Amino acid sequence: ASANECAYAVAEHVGGTIENFVAMMNEKAKELGCQNTHFANPHGLHDENHYTCCYDMALIARAAYQNETFRIIVGTARYTIPPTNKHSEQTDLQNHNEMLYPFQTNKYVYDGCTGGKTGYTNAANSTLVTYAEREGMTLICVVMNTQSPNQWLDSRNLFDYCFDNFQLFNIAENETNYTSAEQKSVGTLNTNEPFVDIDKDAGIVLPKTAEFSDATSKIIYDDVTNDTVGT
């Protein structure tokens, strides 16, 4: 179901060799902040030198979710491959993440699920990475070393707890202690875009028992030594 042969093909296409691609995987994991991860192959089948943890996998999943094509693929419930010159009949594919699509039963379909990936080996047992979104807040849930159907049940319970007890605040819409610093226009060619601004997409997650005003803020300045701020 995981098309391991495709993982090999992609690895050779991108990295030139399997070994080079695995090195790229480990470098990317390090770049993302993973501290308990080491890859030994591109497909994830068991290897003593191939390991990760829930937190590191969440870091990787968060980075992957920034890619629009990835979001489309993991969020697709069903897909039909039309006939090709290699296969005369169409091929119907179903997503095996039962929180997204009722592959075998509809008991585990989760409201707000936007995709994810299942996994299983004899050594790792069932694993699952799932994305879910409600009221503008997207969560990533990672469960490992479970026995089916607990990968679905544990993920649902974790999602329910977070959605029931936490909420996302848009900082720019709620911040009252700071505002944008506008540039003064000099001449007709200059713009009035702010040179100091609050990211309009930045958010903070707080307990539902808290208000945005309960949070404290701190300005951390970039190191601008020798930077030119005006001429």
What are these regions (language model features)?
Residues 1-80:
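Active-site-adjacent helix/loop patches that line small-molecule binding or acyl-intermediate pockets
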Residues 34, 49-51, 55-56, 61-231:
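Domain-terminus/edge residues, biased toward the C-terminal soluble/receptor-binding domains
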